[in-house]
Regions:
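Surface-exposed, charge/polar-rich loops and edge strands
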Residues: 1-182
Length: 182
């Protein structure tokens, strides 16, 4: 399901905006903003809709005001899942006008908001004149690039094998020339 192109009518839900902390884009520090929307009707399916990169304020005492969807909007885009940080995957929410989180842990966010969110995030690609840029644009690799990377790794493995053999042969010759056993 991840990476799949989707189309849905996103209806804003009366829940706070989620701001993923410690994001950078074009040399600026800020947040990735998400809005909870319903994308299905029977049963209602809730999802996080990525709103884009929101530049942070000079002080961390307050959160930036985020422009959100205010009415149902037909959205096309891709589904993706944020990879978990192996050192810290906890949500660590800070409540305010929105919710500042350190990691996008959907299961903990479900508990915090008392809802059931889809395990993937919807990144729209059809929002015209939108206030925020989208820093991550998935670019699929062509088969030629995959083949190129495979050749590159194969050549690196071959060079490593060759260097290892040269070192072992030199060590063996040195040991034999000094009268010792290999």
């Amino acid at each position: 399901v991840i990476g799949v192109k989707v189309q849905a009518e996103a209806k804003p839900e009366p829940l706070p905006v989620v701001l993923l902390d410690n994001q950078t884009f074009q040399g600026k520090v800020g947040y990735l903003a998400y809005q909870v929307v319903s994308v299905g009707q029977d049963p209602i399916t809730l999802a996080l809709l990525e709103l884009g990169f929101v530049e942070g304020l000079r002080t961390r005492d307050s959160l930036p005001t985020v422009t959100t969807l205010t009415s149902p909007t037909n959205v096309t885009g891709r589904l993706y899942r944020k990879s978990m940080n192996p050192l810290s995957s906890e949500l660590m929410p800070e409540m305010g006008e929105g919710i500042r989180v350190q990691n996008l842990n959907i299961s903990e966010l479900n508990e915090l908001l008392n809802v059931e969110l889809m395990p993937a995030v919807l990144q729209p690609d059809n929002l015209e004149n939108w206030a925020y840029p989208f820093p991550w644009n998935p670019l699929p690799l062509t088969s030629a690039k995959h083949f190129g990377y495979a050749v590159q790794w194969f050549v690196m493995a071959g060079v490593f094998l060759l260097l290892t053999m040269v070192v072992c042969i030199r060590w063996f010759r040195k040991a034999v020339s000094q009268g010792g056993e290999a």
